[in-house]
Amino acid sequence: LVLVTGTIPLLESEQDVQCLFVAMALQFRILLVNGQTKMAEPYIKKIRERIQRGGRDELESSLDALECRAALYGGNMERIEAWLEYQAPDENKELYMMDMYAYLIKIRCYLLNGKHMMAIVLAKRLINLIEPVNRYMDLCECYMLSAMACYKAKDNKRLCEELQKALDLAKQYGYYRLLADE
């Protein structure tokens, strides 16, 4: 947290909005993981203002998804449903790499709402999109979320297959924290 927090002023001075977004999102996520949901909520406003000032509207979708992730941690079903209905990207249309974070949050929402098959289908679509371009961290996360959906759907064979793929990627690239955070 200290490293991320210390980097933010440097990134602001360089006006690198994309890297600043990542640093602020990491700080936000650390607050969530540490159970500081109330402290994290006003942080979204600060991130949104910085994005708008920097003219990087393409980051809005990821920021909206980050807000939804806070709602997932806080159990705010009303906010989750609103995000799914009005802000989440539509996976039935063409998938966009820039919305990857939002798609991954959408899978988590599907899992929470008991829509296991929708979670599996979206995970598979994402895997087909990111596997050819070697986005291994996203791939690992997709396999893990797919394994979770298979578990919920009581499909033990596919659960083991998906989990093994996630574990293999985690081992190869050191993504242990990614799996542990879920």
For the regions a protein language model found, what residue spans apply to each?
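Strand-loop-strand
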Residues: 146, 150-166, 171-182
